[in-house]
Amino acid sequence: SVCGLHCHISRARGIVAWQKRIDNLLHVADTYLEKNPDFIDVGSGMFGEMDSSLSAQFEAAPSYEDYAKVVAGTMAKHYEQATKKPILFSEPGTTLIAKYLSLVTTVDNIKTIKDRCFVTVDSSYYNTGEIVLMKKLPYRIVRNGKGDTRSIVKKTNIMGFTCLEQDCIYTDFPESVQEGDIIEFGNVGGYSIVSKPPFIQPNCKILSITPEGDLVEIKRQETY
């Protein structure tokens, strides 16, 4: 017999979508199960904590408390009179870690075609996760460059090493950079590690910063 329900949707993070999700799960449980389920798993697909520059690109990003009120609140009310209440599960993996993983990459070369600069770095959009295809990542520049070539402000695309047209990490980058500069892109913890194929270069090492400010290698660089 069916002892629980599981729903996992990645592309609907708004609070209205989450209300529909829990409403439909409860409807399925009432309609098709002989008794109350042991558990209801609502999966993931929530907004997590973000830098202000990234959260500003969304119309509304609910907080964890907002999700809890809708999902847990609706479920608690639905089973208020039940002797045995289902356990509520959630799977907020990317939701929790995305903000706390950054990609540190170096400018390799700069090429200008007509009035557009293409800045190639020593990483690719595979290292950032698919968020770069939809939004502009928060970033920080370490001015380490010694090259003579500089990019054109507001007419620059940051491109990855695959040289594929879709390998664009940042369109219309708003600052000028030069060869050798280091760019740190934030909020890349959404499947950016496991989804990176060994194409052109294997995956990079992962470093963790301790509370004392020391760097600790927690995953070595991949080799062929």
Feature annotation, model-predicted:
Residues 70, 80-224:
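Charged (often Lys/Glu-rich) extended helix/loop segments that serve as interaction or gating elements
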Residues 1-109:
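Active-site loop/helix belt of alpha/beta enzymes
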